[in-house]
Every structure is written in structure tokens, then in C-alpha cells.
Amino acid sequence: STAIYGSKSANGVIVVETVRPEPGRLRVSYSGNFTYQTPDLTDYNLMNASEKLNFERLAGRYTAKSIYDSQDELDALYYSRLKEVRRGVNTYWLSEPLRAVLNHSHNLYIDGGDNAMVYGIGVAYSNDDGVMKGSDRETMSGNIKLSYRAKSLIFTNDFNIDVTNWDREPVDFFTFAQANPYYRKYNDDGTVPELLEDMNVAGTTIYNPLYLYNIVNTNKTGEMSLRNNFSIVWRFLNAFQLRG
């Protein structure tokens, strides 16, 4: 059995043959599966805008630590953020890139034949979207199997094709998790600002993850695989078989 089926079959194998369809009639089978997924953010316990700003102040974020730091600029940065907090800004970023999704998969198989020839044709499709917006995967596959029996010989050909396409989210979840709650998502006119803050301290540029998310970009990957297996089985003495 090792020579025929590989090293994992050293202790022996059990060969199972499916029930042949009734001669002259087609047999059709279908299966489908639907799943609903929704993100769960209950484990995240983040500081609100006021708590985060006060934490940064106590940690010395707005205190000059060297001659290269400008205390005036740090004070201006702190009070501009405090102004946002006092006007009611308290942004929850985590839910922005997430969504609830309904995924589905389908399998259709048709087979038929007679005592000598058996054939089967199968197609499958699955749509697997992630809870991150823009994270999608689509899989399609097909299969054609032919089996011909001539006395003690069985000729089998099995052809398979698989096509997979997937998209990745343009901005990762961690980028949204890092965005501070005292930043506004939108301008007063409803537009999405490119930067979360006009002030640029110590060369740090803070981009709005929503703006990055809405930039037209493509992050697609696809692959296709083809497989064809042909085998001949010779059964003899009612107890032995050779496979090639």
C-alpha cells in the first residue's frame, strides 16, 4: 500500500467505491451553505477622548524634554486638542473598517453512466467576505471525472480546475485602533480630511485612516490551478490489484 498510496498508508488503506448511478439515468446533487458573521468589539476597552488626552499630559507628552523641543508648540498642540475634546469630539474608530457579512457556498454535481462507463461533472462556488471592508475572497472550481471498466481493468481520468480571487483591505485594522479619539473623522462640511491634524510636530504626519481607505487603489490577487490524474487499475485473482 505504501508504494501505491504513499508513506501515510504504510499500515494499510481502505479503498471505497461510490455507489454507481442507475444505468441510463442522471443523478443530480446540490448542497449550499450560508453563514452570517459580525465583528465583536466587546473585548476592547479604550479610553475616551478626555481620558486619552489627560493620560498623554500626565505622561509628559506635552512637556519639552530637550532644547530641540518648543514648549510653545507643545502647549499649542495640547490646547488645540483640548478644544476639540471640550466641543464634544469623542471618535470611536474601531467600527469604521468593519462590517457584517453574509457568506455563501454552493456545490452542484451531476453523474451518470452504465455498467461500463461512469462520468461525473461538478462545479462549486464560494463567496467568503471578511468582516474588514474590502477583504473579499471568491473561489470557483470545476471537476470532470470519467471511469471506464473493461473486465478486470479500470481506466479513470480526473480533471480539476480551481480559480481563486481575493482582495485585501487597503488599510489594516491596527491603523484605526491607533487613531486617537480626540480627532474628528469629518470636516464641518462632511468631507473627509486627509490629515487628522494641521499641526505637524517633530516631523510626524498623522493621516486620516478613513481618507486612506477611500483612496482608489487595487490590492487584488488571483490564482488558477489545473490538475489531471489518470490511473489504470488491474484487478486479478479476486484479491489483488495493480495501480498505475
Residue spans for each PLM region:
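N-terminal plug
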Residues: S1-K8, T38-T42
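Transmembrane beta-barrel strand/turn architecture of Gram-negative outer membrane proteins
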Residues: S9-Q37, D114-G190, T218-G244
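Residues embedded in well-ordered regular secondary structure
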Residues: R20-K133, E169-F173, N208-N219, V233
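Acidic, low-complexity proline/glycine-rich segments
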Residues: E197-M199
